[in-house]
Amino acid sequence: MFIKGVILSSYGVNGYARVKSISNNFCDFINLKNNKVLLKKSNSSSVEVKVVDVNIKGNSLFLKFEEIDTPEAVRPLIGFELWVDDSLASSLKEGEYYLGKLIGYAIVNNNKKLGEVVAFFEYLNSVFLEVRVGIKFFFIPFLSIYIGDINTQEKTIELKVLDLLK
């Protein structure tokens, strides 16, 4: 499952939710129509809903969920993340990766395992991989100057700059 967006507010009088896209690609949201998604929020329960309509107006994205027909019904869902099945995740271009799928990958250099990706975080316009080496943790910028080949078959990520693990 992948997070695809976050509910920001209600919109209109018919129960539409204004959604922020995580991927910034609105076109992929069209595929959600007539599919079920999972709405999740930390420290709260999750709810499965069916998307019955997708509406894109300018730079805004609106979703209509089955049996949610008023702004009042949408308001408790504000802040919920929209999770979708892998088959409905945004398509990737060559060289793009779902960061969550990189968790568990080995960090290697010259085919020697140095550590393992345990998490990632995004800060401003940068992504960092959190890597465990023994009992220590390091943050590696997810940039081509530091990261080399990513082998999805062997689940390895080449580290070009070993000094990042000191």
Curated annotation (Swiss-Prot):
Keywords: Chaperone, Cytoplasm, Ribosome biogenesis, rRNA processing. SUPFAM superfamilies: PRC-barrel domain, Translation proteins. It is found in: Cytoplasm. It comes from the Bacteria. Belongs to the RimM family. An accessory protein needed during the final step in the assembly of 30S ribosomal subunit, possibly for assembly of the head region. Essential for efficient processing of 16S rRNA. May be needed both before and after RbfA during the maturation of 16S rRNA. It has affinity for free ribosomal 30S subunits but not for 70S ribosomes. This is Ribosome maturation factor RimM. It comes from Borreliella burgdorferi (strain ATCC 35210 / DSM 4680 / CIP 102532 / B31) (Borrelia burgdorferi). The gene is rimM.
